[in-house]
Amino acid sequence: MTGPELESSGRNYLGFLEGDDGYCSFIRFTGEQLRVYGEDPLFRNLSMCSSGVYLSLVTDGDRLSFDCRTLELVSQLLPAIAELGWDGVKEIIRGLSKKIEQGAPLPRQREKFDLVTDDGQRISRMPKNGHLYFEFRNGSRRAMKLRLYFPVFPYVALRRLESNGRLEPGTATLPRILCLGDSITQGFNAVHPSLTWTSRLADLLGVDALNQGVGGYYFDAASLEGLEGLAREGPSRPALVTVAYGTNDWDLVPGLSTLRERARAYFARLAGLFPGVPAYVLTPIWRGDLDKPKACGSFDEVARAIAEEAGRYPGNRVVDGLSIPIQDRKYFQDNWLHPNEEGFRIMADRLFCAIGPARAAEPGSCDGSDVASPGSGLPVAAPAPR
């Protein structure tokens, strides 16, 4: 596949970069947002990861392969976005080499590429510098629909995507949702990018999910800069938005009044960007240290403050994070903060109940078995109880 074919295959991204060497990568944020995240080395790195991005493909072969490069960040990349826009970035990305200085360490790499077939096969490979291949069952050599999910970490690029059969970009266009949040939204510790809560929720709703989670982040109205283009009427406009901040605010913000001010400014900016678009605001989920005192107040006080600030806008639906039944360390990959795949599954199911069908009259009350089949479409939901 050529660069333009890769670009047309991509889903859940806002920027596409291709170097003279043919390596292509996908960016989840606007240039304005990347300027904000670029002020901190950790946020800069995490914002450049391709979390949630996948390629939609069709092949009658049974093998897929490509050249992969795991890239750290170019020191000139963020200034170029700020000063030159995407054209400047495309110039800088040309000839990008493997050895690029990294400003801050990424989390330990565990995440993989996932190739998911339309009959439920999932084949995973760790990203590395070199050639990757995926083999899957397709004995009848039918035209099989595939999704190649990019890893949550690190920042990767690929070229020479090939199959041993005919290979084309997928043509299906799905409605889009926008997922805003921290590391839990980004998908920390999921291992399989197709099994984060955002990917699972998108499958349940029959949509694509632009994942704008950034690990360690918090309520910051500036992080919404540059989304005006996404907010305009058209296919890029999200059908709904999810917002899931608060756990880092509880750790970092010096006082509850400051948190309220930041959340208030954030929700005001969000409402101004997406009038008429429902926003599902997930208050912080359970964590293993929620009983410890913090300068910002108790965990319950923070959750209540977020719910109250979100409630100022009629388009916001508040979902109580503590109502999600993962209040046990067995649902957490790190034993206390970041859910594992089962934890993410439960999160997605419960959020689907909050968003979804009329039979979930009390969002959060349905159990994991009471979930509509994937691809059921994007239903209209009433506000979640506060």
Each model region followed by its residue ranges:
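N-terminal secretory targeting modules
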Residues: M1-I177, A354-R386
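Alpha-helical cap/lid subdomain in secreted, periplasmic
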Residues: G61, L224-R386
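Acidic/histidine-rich helix-loop elements
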Residues: N211-A221, D251, W336
